[in-house]
C-alpha cells in the first residue's frame, strides 16, 4: 500500500495553512547515531535477525502519523496528503550492539476504521499516541477516545504521547485560522499534564518536516518497547520461584516461632 503523503489537513474546524516547503532528501547515513545505545539504518519493509519491537501509531486522522514514519524511514517528506488505511514499515537499528527490527504500524484514525484498527494491536510493544499541537480537537480525543481504546485492547502496553507538527506552533497563518475559531495551539504544559494523567511513558513534541525531536520519539519507542517486552517475561520466572520462596519464608517463621515458644 502506498504511504500517506503530504502535510495533513488540520482536523480542527479551521482551514489548513498553505503547504510548507519540502526539505531536500537526505542521505540515509547522514544523521549520525540514533541516541545512546541506539544506532543503525532505516528502511521500508525488509527484516532483520534478532529481536523485534512492534510500535503502533494511533491518533486522529490527518495529525501527521504517516509523515512521521516516512520522514524517519526515508529522511524525506511527503508532498501530497493521501489518507492512510493501514500500512507497515520497518527500521533496523542496533541497540547495545545487537540488531533490533522496529516494526512500525501506521493506522487510520477515522471513525470508519474503529472496528478494523484493533486488529493491528496484537502483540504491540509500544504505542505512539499522536495529536497535532495545532489541533485542540485531536488533543481532546487523546483522553476521550484513544487512551480508552488502547487500554481496552492492550491494558499493559506502554504509551508515548507525541505532539506532532510542532513547526506550526508559531506559523502566522495557522494562528490566524485558529483565532477565527477562538482556539489556540495546545500548551506544552497541558500536554505534559495529560501524559501524566494517562500514565504515558513520556511526552515528546516533534516535527516530521524539520525532523526536530524525530529521532527522540523513535529512540524512546525502541527503549520502552524493549523494556515492556522484557517485563512480560519476568512474571513467568517469578511464578516458578514463588513456591520455593513461600516454603523458605514458612521455615523461617516456624523457627522464630519455636524460639519464642
Curated annotation (Swiss-Prot):
Where do we see the Glycyl lysine isopeptide (Lys-Gly) (interchain with G-Cter in ubiquitin) cross-link in this protein? Answer: 180, 251
Q: Which domain of life is it from?
A: Eukaryota
Q: Where is the lipid attached (S-palmitoyl cysteine)?
A: 259
The known PTMs are summarized as:
Tyrosine phosphorylated by SRC in response to PTK2B/PYK2 activation.
Membrane topology, record value: Lipid-anchor
Q: List compositional bias (Low complexity) regions by residue number.
A: 7-16
Chain spans, region Disordered: 1-48
* A single GO BP: G1/S transition of mitotic cell cycle
Which GO cellular component does the record give, naming just one?
A: podosome
The answer to whether UniProt assigns keyword Nucleotide-binding to this entry is: yes
Report keywords, A-Z.
Cell junction, Cell membrane, Cell projection, Golgi apparatus, GTP-binding, Isopeptide bond, Lipoprotein, Magnesium, Membrane, Metal-binding, Nucleotide-binding, Palmitate, Phosphoprotein, Ubl conjugation
Q: What spans are recorded as compositionally biased (Gly residues)?
A: 32-48
Keyword Nucleotide-binding listed? The answer is: yes
Report the GO molecular function annotations.
GTP binding; GTPase activity; metal ion binding
Please give the SUPFAM superfamilies that the UniProt record associates with this protein. P-loop containing nucleoside triphosphate hydrolases
Q: Note the Gene3D superfamilies from the entry.
A: P-loop containing nucleotide triphosphate hydrolases
**So which cofactors does this thing need?**
Mg(2+)
**For binding GTP, which residues are annotated in this chain's numbering?**
59-66, 106-110, 164-167
Can you say where in the cell this protein is located? Answer: Cell membrane; Golgi apparatus membrane; Cell junction, Focal adhesion; Cell projection, Podosome
Similarity field: Belongs to the small GTPase superfamily. Rho family.
Q: Summarize the protein's role.
A: Binds to and activates protein kinase PAK1. Plays a role in the regulation of cell morphology, cytoskeletal organization and focal adhesion assembly during cell migration. Also stimulates quiescent cells to reenter the cell cycle. Has no detectable GTPase activity but its high intrinsic guanine nucleotide exchange activity suggests it is constitutively GTP-bound.
Complexes and interactors: Interacts with PAK1. Interacts with PAK3. Interacts with ARHGAP30 in a GTP-independent manner. In its GTP-loaded conformation, interacts with ARHGAP31. Interacts with PTK2B/PYK2. Interacts with PAK4; interaction protects RHOU from ubiquitination and subsequent degradation.
- Its protein name is Rho-related GTP-binding protein RhoU
Provide the species name: Mus musculus
Amino acid at each position: 500500500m502506498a504511504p500517506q503523503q503530504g502535510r495533513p489537513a488540520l482536523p480542527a474546524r479551521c482551514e489548513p495553512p498553505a503547504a510548507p516547503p519540502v526539505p531536500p532528501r537526505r542521505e540515509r547515513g547522514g544523521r549520525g547515531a540514533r541516541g545512546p545505545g541506539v544506532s543503525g539504518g532505516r528502511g521500508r519493509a525488509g527484516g532483520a535477525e534478532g529481536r523485534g519491537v512492534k510500535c503502533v501509531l494511533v491518533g486522529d486522522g490527518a495529525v501527521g502519523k504517516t509523515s512521521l514514519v516516512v520522514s524517519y524511514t526515508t529522511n524525506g517528506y511527503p508532498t501530497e496528503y493521501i489518507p492512510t488505511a493501514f500500512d507497515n514499515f520497518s527500521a533496523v537499528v542496533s541497540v547495545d550492539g545487537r540488531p533490533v527490527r522496529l516494526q512500525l504500524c501506521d493506522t487510520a484514525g477515522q471513525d470508519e476504521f474503529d472496528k478494523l484498527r484493533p486488529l493491528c494491536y496484537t502483540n504491540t510493544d509500544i504505542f505512539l499516541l499522536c495529536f497535532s499541537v495545532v489541533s485542540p480537537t485531536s488533543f481532546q480525543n487523546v483522553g476521550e477516545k484513544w487512551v480508552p481504546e488502547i487500554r481496552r485492547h492492550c491494558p499493559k502496553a506502554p504509551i508515548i504521547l507525541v505532539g506532532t507538527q510542532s513547526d506550526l506552533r508559531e506559523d502566522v497563518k495557522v494562528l490566524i485560522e485558529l483565532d477565527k475559531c477562538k482556539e489556540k495551539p495546545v500548551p506544552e504544559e497541558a500536554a505534559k499534564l495529560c501524559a501524566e494523567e494517562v500514565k504515558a511513558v513520556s511526552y515528546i513534541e516533534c516535527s516530521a518536516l524539520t525532523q526536530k525531536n524525530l529521532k527522540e520519539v523513535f529512540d524512546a519507542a525502541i527503549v520502552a518497547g524493549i523494556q515492556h517486552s522484557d517485563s512480560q517475561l519476568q512474571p513467568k520466572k517469578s511464578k516458578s520461584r514463588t513456591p520455593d520462596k513461600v516454603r523458605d519464608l514458612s521455615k523461617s517463621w516456624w523457627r522464630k516461632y519455636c524460639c519464642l515458644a
